[in-house]
């Protein structure tokens, strides 16, 4: 954008028709690179897809070529996503959104794997999988790859990026405008609605809207039952076997008879409920709208539903576009088994120093870490009062270099405590009275 006139001089897009929340994140980074003995001014932007977008900042032309790949089309009424998306080879992407249903589901234990696979029973994955009303979508990347803290460039023109690799579920469902079902006289007078209130409303709510817990607190989910007769067959909705399987992990709701260990939902109840859902969908069809939200995919230990590492730190050579190294960043702890796993969710950021040090923060273990910029080796770590919540800063005062950490904790599930600390360090060699 021309700062004087506001005119758009050029633009470059990563994800077309983005319905996955795969935005370009972090502040743009400016540097210069050598191409065929010519110095080119470039601007670098990072995407949650894992792509590193590097273009000539005068012309907007990408430094490296890219191609297009075919992807699925969306299935929302009257809407389709783009049939093609950009595919970058260089700079090498530091992550991918593709979730492999066969290999990426957690293998930490049979119990955890079984739980996650059950959560994914109606899900699909792939390369930019199309969101739709009949299937959930599971991808990496809703929180990166890279995230809002962005990356940093060191004095050897290497790009350092903290990134995430844990999956999210994207769901779409029908809802009623203003949620009027439980105040609709035509509906509430139905005898079958009383059956619903007695057996289902404690989880799916009196207005059938269900519950999708915020990822800031957890991953509880009870699907909306609005429009269900439009989406599923009568056979599947009245099958007692399917009902029991779908409620396999619903031990906290009133499905079991404690005396006989039998389900207290019977075939006659399912038949009655199907008739109710059919009537409700007929009455409210003109008021039904589509809602879509995402949620972390967690296992029953509240760990990400994929295999660790769940967070990385990486370095990319900006001249060649090649990844130089990639190491796990942070430690995740299973609060049930007390086991530690390398690489965790991170929302802090990095800075680099002229001496070849990378300083990184933002993991849930509340440590800030110091790395060798040449190889990614961890040199030192320091525990903060709360998780780092923004990139570290460095400054000079009376000839001494200081490093500061904004330590306030995180807002997503698993970050635990929050506060308002700002923690500053300086070199021991500066700790003389005249420099204080």
Region spans (language model):
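Conserved blade-ending motifs and adjacent loop-strand segments that build the rim/top face
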Residues: 15-27, 67-74, 134, 138-149, ...
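Generic long, charged, amphipathic alpha-helical segments
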Residues: 290-293, 318, 322-378
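Blade-level signature of beta-propeller repeat domains, shared across WD40, Kelch, NHL, RCC1
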Residues: 156-162, 168-174, 393-436
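Repeat-blade elements of multi-bladed beta-propeller folds
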Residues: 22-47, 85, 89-93, 148-152, ...
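Axial heme c-ligation environment in periplasmic c-type cytochrome domains
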Residues: 202, 211-230, 234-283
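Phosphate/diphosphate-binding loops
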Residues: 27-77, 427-429
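Beta-propeller blade signature
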Residues: 1-6, 56-60, 311-317, 418-431
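Electrostatic cytochrome c docking/interface patches
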Residues: 174-195, 211
């Amino acid at each position: 954008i021309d700062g004087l006139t506001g005119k758009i001089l050029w633009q470059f897009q990563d994800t077309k028709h983005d319905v996955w929340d795969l935005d370009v994140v972090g502040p743009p980074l400016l540097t210069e690179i050598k191409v065929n003995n010519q110095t080119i001014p470039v601007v670098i932007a990072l995407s949650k897809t894992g792509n590193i977008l590097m273009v000539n900042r005068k012309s907007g032309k990408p430094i490296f070529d890219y191609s297009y790949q075919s992807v699925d089309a969306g299935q929302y009424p009257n809407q389709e996503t783009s049939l093609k998306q950009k595919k970058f080879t260089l700079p090498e992407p530091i992550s991918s959104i593709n979730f492999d249903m066969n290999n990426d589901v957690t293998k930490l234990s049979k119990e955890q794997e079984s739980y996650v696979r059950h959560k994914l029973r109606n899900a699909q994955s792939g390369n930019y999988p199309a969101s739709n009303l009949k299937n959930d979508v599971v991808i990496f990347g809703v929180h990166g790859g890279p995230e809002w803290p962005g990356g940093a460039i060191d004095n050897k023109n290497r790009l350092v990026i903290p990134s995430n690799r844990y999956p999210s579920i994207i769901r779409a469902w029908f809802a009623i405008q203003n949620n009027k079902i439980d105040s609709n006289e035509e509906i509430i007078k139905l005898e079958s609605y009383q059956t619903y209130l007695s057996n289902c409303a404690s989880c799916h709510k009196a207005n059938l809207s269900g519950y999708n817990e915020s990822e800031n607190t957890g991953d509880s989910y009870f699907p909306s039952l609005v429009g269900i007769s439009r989406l599923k067959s009568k056979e599947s909705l009245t099958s007692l076997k399917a009902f029991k399987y779908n409620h396999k992990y619903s031990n906290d709701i009133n499905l079991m008879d404690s005396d006989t260990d039998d389900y207290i939902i019977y075939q006659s109840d399912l038949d009655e409920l199907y008739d109710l859902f059919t009537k409700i969908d007929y009455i409210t069809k003109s008021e039904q709208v589509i809602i879509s939200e995402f949620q972390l995919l967690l296992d029953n230990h509240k760990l990400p539903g994929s295999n660790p590492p769940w967070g990385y730190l990486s370095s990319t050579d900006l001249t060649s576009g090649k990844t130089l190294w990639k190491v796990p960043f942070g430690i995740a702890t299973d609060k049930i088994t007390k086991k530690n796993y390398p690489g965790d969710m991170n929302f802090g950021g990095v800075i680099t120093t002229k001496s070849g040090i990378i300083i990184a923060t933002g993991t849930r273990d509340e440590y800030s870490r110091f790395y060798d910029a040449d190889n990614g080796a961890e040199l030192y770590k320091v525990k903060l009062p709360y998780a780092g919540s923004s990139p570290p800063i460095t400054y000079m005062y009376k000839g001494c270099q200081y490093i500061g950490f904004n330590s306030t904790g995180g807002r997503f599930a698993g970050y635990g405590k929050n506060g308002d600390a700002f923690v500053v360090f300086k070199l021991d060699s500066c700790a003389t009275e005249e420099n204080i």
